[in-house]
């Protein structure tokens, strides 16, 4: 205890919580503090892999925050609600790179972006052009020929306590 318990503190505490093996359990968090006099502070978390956390991970974060919270605060930790995302793309591959290596790197880089944007302030946008740029920047990709996000060639948005969950990246490759 001792901190003021502002929203940044709750995000920091959520990200500090570790399991019995010392591994962080929350990749990011977003906080809502209604100004209604109840002392309730709602903390929605995602896992370190940008997926919905397990009940155990939620409990670990709840218990950790309970040790840090200021007197009078009532933190309530929950899983953020996921918005499933499927990305379908067609790329031209550069010679000298294996198809599997390129696909694996695209998947990893897109997943890293999902975690990075998981809980930006306000409405979160999964920007169509940013995703295209991420794929284009992968070593072995010479061109992104076609791209859709959830069947559309457009950005999508998520409100408070929601995050994007990457359900699949379907990649067709030509040289």
What are these regions (language model features)?
Residues 1-124:
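Carbohydrate-recognition loop of C-type lectin domains
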């Amino acid at each position: 205890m001792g901190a003021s318990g502002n929203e940044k503190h709750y995000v920091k505490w959520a990200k500090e919580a570790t399991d019995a093996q010392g591994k962080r359990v929350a990749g990011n968090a977003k906080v809502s503090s209604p100004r209604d006099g109840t002392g309730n502070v709602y903390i929605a978390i995602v896992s370190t892999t940008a997926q919905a956390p397990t009940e155990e991970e939620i409990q670990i974060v709840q218990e950790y925050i309970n040790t840090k919270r200021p007197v009078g605060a009532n933190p309530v930790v929950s899983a953020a609600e996921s918005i499933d995302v499927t990305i379908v793309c067609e790329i031209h591959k550069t010679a000298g790179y294996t198809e599997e290596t390129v696909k694996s790197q695209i998947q990893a880089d897109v997943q890293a972006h999902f975690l990075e944007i998981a809980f930006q302030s306000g409405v979160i946008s999964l920007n169509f052009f940013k995703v295209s740029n991420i794929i284009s920047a992968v070593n072995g990709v010479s061109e992104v020929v076609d791209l859709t996000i959830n069947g559309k060639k457009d950005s999508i948005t998520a409100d408070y306590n929601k995050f994007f969950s990457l359900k699949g990246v379907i990649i067709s490759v030509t040289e």
